[in-house]
A protein has these predicted regions:
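Conserved AMP-binding A3 loop
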Residues: 25-27, 148-175
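Gly/Ser/Thr-rich phosphate-binding loop
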Residues: 235-238, 248-308, 321
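Conserved beta-loop-beta connector loops within the AMP-binding
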Residues: 309, 323-343, 379-380, 439-443, ...
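Conserved pre-ATP/AMP-binding loop-to-beta segment of ANL
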Residues: 8, 12-13, 131-152, 159, ...
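Conserved AMP-binding/adenylate-forming core of the ANL superfamily
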Residues: 13-44, 52-59, 66-68, 85-87, ...
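AMP-binding/adenylate-forming catalytic core of the ANL superfamily
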Residues: 344, 350, 374-457, 469
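Conserved ATP/PPi-binding loop(s) of AMP-dependent carboxylate-activating enzymes
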Residues: 315-319, 330-362, 398-400
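Conserved AMP-binding/adenylation subdomain of ANL enzymes
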Residues: 171-188, 196-236, 250
Length: 496
């Protein structure tokens, strides 16, 4: 059975997609996918071709039609949101992508080798009519096995990298997500995370393979755009901690259907206060997952495990092997903190060439993937992540865990979002606390509360902002933010 075979075998009258008041049946979804498949075929895009996909604005349904059509015709495809993501997707030689399918405003300064293809779907009308193609079923099912996905890492270092998911790797990643579709065709999935992320890509396909409905969640990738009604319709939410916090803080009441709803939270640490708030207002079950674009899911479990350790992410899953090692690669005893390394049955072997081989060789080594995390593996197999190597910083000779500070900041009343950043100032390294809050950031009580969170005699500065920028996976791009903060601090010093 192919990846898309179960989708096309579903009851044509069953609901596949819900966007506001619009209901799209499986019959319509499949017709739209085939219409775009033929439209691309007629323009020379097929098995082995490379296709970048970017749809701006409230076009979540059509984004999915485009991705499914790319798989249908056997194309190698990538989800594009900027030139920053386009460059690694094209590869060092620029030969990974041949065409760029977009709706809305196109990216500027496209490489000459990339052929732009534009469609402008309006509303939810049948795509065959909108494209002016004859409605007909795709008659080349054998092409699908050539499909591949160019998956981009989250870019938490400020520099995204690309991996090639073969057809088999795609199938494995989607099967992992499928194990969470426990209600089968009765599931109503609301994926509150961007399509360009690993989870945002695989969960909807897994839901459709099970005959379930996918709920459109917003006009962008900002959790604040999610309607109360959309969440209430859902039985399964896939969400980042940042978006979860935003939704909870913006809602004045609990969500109906609470007892039949499960939340899967991934991408970062889940503070116990956030977990408890989610259990009170959103769902009866909160699960945490740990994994990466490079390896797929590595571990998972009930968020209650965070009572044992704030960074608990569950137990190994899907044939994953997890080790905690020292700097020389020697395995450490259970319960001892060290460097996390991972091996999974369908992990990628390397990034697509991008001229940064040193980074690649340090992350993929001797059949292991080193995600850059520090963690503990307990005797019973529980994995706890203490933070990324880059998130444990040295300020004034004292090592400080930024995630630990952030978790404690979010426990303070009136703090909607927060992050801690090390800024390399010309005089000395600085610990900068960035807050989204209605509080006066110069208030003495706030300074005293934060002072108790950091090591004694560690100086810090507080910067207040309207929002903390995060990527599609809900992660803060620390290097980018640190540079912006440095510029701000230097300007303040210059201005006096």
């Amino acid at each position: 059975m192919t990846l898309l075979g179960p989708i096309f075998g579903n009851d044509p009258a069953a609901v596949a997609f819900v966007g506001g008041k619009e209901r799209i049946s499986y019959g319509r979804l499949c017709e739209d996918v085939d219409a775009l498949a033929w439209w691309l075929h007629d323009r020379g895009i097929g098995a082995g071709s490379g296709l970048g996909i970017q749809f701006k604005g409230g076009l979540s349904y059509w984004v999915w039609v485009a991705h499914l059509a790319a798989i249908r015709i056997g194309a190698r495809h990538a989800t594009i949101d900027s030139l920053k993501s386009l460059r690694p997707a094209m590869g060092a030689d620029g030969n990974q992508l041949d065409a760029y399918l977009f709706a809305g405003a196109a990216l500027r300064n496209l490489p000459p080798s990339l052929r732009p293809l534009s469609i402008e779907p309006r509303g939810f009308g049948p795509l065959a009519e909108q494209l002016g193609v004859k409605p007909r079923a795709w008659t080349k099912p054998e092409t699908e096995c050539h499909a591949a996905r160019i998956a981009l890492t989250s870019g938490t270092t400020g520099r995204p990298h690309a991996l090639l998911w073969t057809y088999d790797i795609m199938a494995d990643r989607i099967a992992q997500a499928g194990s969470d579709i426990v209600n089968g065709a009765q599931e109503r999935l609301c994926p509150l995370i961007g399509t360009g992320t690993t989870a945002g890509f695989r969960y909807p396909i897994a839901a459709w393979r099970a005959g379930a409905a996918v709920l459109s969640w917003s006009n962008g990738n900002d959790g604040r755009a999610v309607s109360h009604a959309t969440v209430q319709r859902s039985t399964l939410l896939v969400i980042s901690p940042a978006n979860l916090r935003t939704i909870i803080s913006s809602s004045k009441s609990s969500y109906q259907g609470h007892g039949g709803r499960t939340l899967i939270v991934l991408g970062a640490r889940v503070p116990t206060s956030l977990r408890d708030a989610a259990l009170r207002t959103m769902g009866a079950r909160v699960n945490v997952h740990y994994g990466s674009t490079e390896t797929g899911r590595v571990a998972g479990g009930d968020a209650a495990l965070t009572d044992r350790h704030p960074g608990a992410v569950g137990f190994a899953s899907g044939g994953a092997t997890i080790e905690i090692v020292d700097a020389d690669g020697v395995a450490l005893p259970a319960g001892e903190a060290g460097i996390v390394r991972i091996r999974t049955p369908s992990m990628c072997g390397d990034y697509l060439p991008d001229g940064n081989s040193d980074r690649q060789s340090s992350i993929f080594k001797d059949g292991w993937f080193y995600p850059g995390d520090h963690g503990i593996l307990f005797e019973d197999g529980l994995l706890a992540i203490e933070g990324r190597a880059t998130e444990t910083v040295n300020i004034g000779g004292i090592k400080i865990s930024l995630p630990d500070i952030e978790s404690r900041l979010l426990e303070l009343p009136g703090i909607a979002d927060a992050c801690a950043i090390r800024v390399a100032h010309r005089k000395d390294d600085l610990l900068v606390i960035v807050l989204v809050s209605a509080q006066d950031h110069e208030s003495k009580p706030l300074h005293e509360a934060i002072g108790k969170m950091v090591p004694k005699n560690t100086p810090f500065r507080i910067v207040k902002t309207r929002a903390i920028a995060r990527n599609a996976a809900g992660k803060v791009q620390r290097d980018v933010l640190a540079q912006k903060l440095l510029t701000l601090i230097e300007k303040r010093e210059t201005d006096g």
